[in-house]
Regions:
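Repeat-based scaffolding regions
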Residues: 1-204
Length: 204
């Protein structure tokens, strides 16, 4: 580490390389906060440096700092720091974790808590909102604020497109203002999946 510091002082042009190497060392040593302190100013001054963006993303990921990583997704995508298939997997991972970590603010009214869950869903790009895993996470967040009715139509559309047992199980937990629509959807699925154990439990 001392050699890296000396390199930065003696060879200013090598400073970026030395900082990247130092950040990698800090990450390996699990000194994540120090790595972030080192990387954030560099990312701010050199926003298009893909190596720095990847290191910062890795650090946030290892810290479980999903909120900071979510804010970094735009730059990771814009500067093509990660290949498209890995980028989509990372996005899904980040939003799934944000949803699973959702805790309504106890100081809020019930309506404010419902809005809090809705705002989290609005953070998710529209192109990802038909992902069954994310809808499961959204359902779980809405369940905490007694607002699962909001997601009924989205669940039906998603299950119609692709059968997803976890989503079907949650469909059975829906408390809805339109139970007849819920029953109609369930009966349609039953004709296509007459012996599906998850569906049979969901329909009671």
């Amino acid at each position: 580490r001392m050699l890296l510091e000396q390199l930065k002082v003696g060879h200013p042009k090598a400073k970026l390389l030395a900082d990247k190497a130092l950040a990698e060392m800090l990450i390996l040593e699990e000194q994540f906060h120090k790595a972030v302190q080192l990387l954030q100013p560099i990312a701010a001054s050199k926003p298009g440096d893909r190596g720095i963006l990847r290191l910062l993303a890795d650090t946030y990921y290892l810290m479980g700092d999903w909120s900071s990583l979510q804010k970094l997704l735009h730059d990771l995508n814009y500067y093509k720091a990660i290949n498209p298939s890995n980028m989509k997997a990372l996005e899904l991972d980040v939003y799934a974790n944000l949803l699973s970590d959702f805790i309504p603010d106890p100081e809020f009214t019930l309506q404010e808590q419902k809005d809090q869950a809705g705002e989290l869903w609005e953070l998710i790009p529209k192109r990802l909102r038909n992902d069954a895993e994310l809808i499961c996470g959204y359902f779980d967040a809405l369940q905490q604020v007694n607002d699962t009715d909001r997601v009924q139509l989205l669940m039906v559309k998603t299950i119609n497109k692709r059968w997803h047992p976890e989503l079907v199980a949650r469909f059975g937990q829906l408390v809805t203002s339109a139970p007849e629509k819920q029953l109609l959807a369930g009966e349609k699925w039953l004709s296509d999946h007459p012996e599906d154990p998850v569906l049979l439990v969901a329909l009671g």
